[in-house]
């Protein structure tokens, strides 16, 4: 099975298995944000043969998706005007010399959390998402490096692979590890 078909199968799994207490991406604006990726962020970063893979924590909240439909999010899968997205794109260019489109980017938690963007997602839910979606995406894409944006993302991936979980980013950043042929790194978000 090709990488594209394997990733599409994971997207289909995500669509069919929305956990209790969360919403699916298709539940907003008549499905305008839905896609055939695990995360809509991949719309702009879906290089299946990427050397660099990015894993962000979560894609959206109920509050943010309940606002009027955003054409940028529909087409790109993210808001280019947000400072975190501008910073990420600049850092990719500065440190790797690549645009976002040369990466494979996804979210650890591919469902819509209730509340606002700072609403808490329990660790057990992040772990379930890592096992069912993030780790399989890493295995399919098989990049040289995965950059986990944020300590919770890095620690969830680490724990799901039975690796130590650092207490803070200062400890996490130098403590990358190898999973199969891929190095997993932590970085601040």
Regions found by a protein language model. Name each.
Residues 166-189:
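Short, flexible loop segments at boundaries between secondary-structure elements
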Residues 2-147, 151-164, 183-188:
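A polyanion-binding, active-site-adjacent surface
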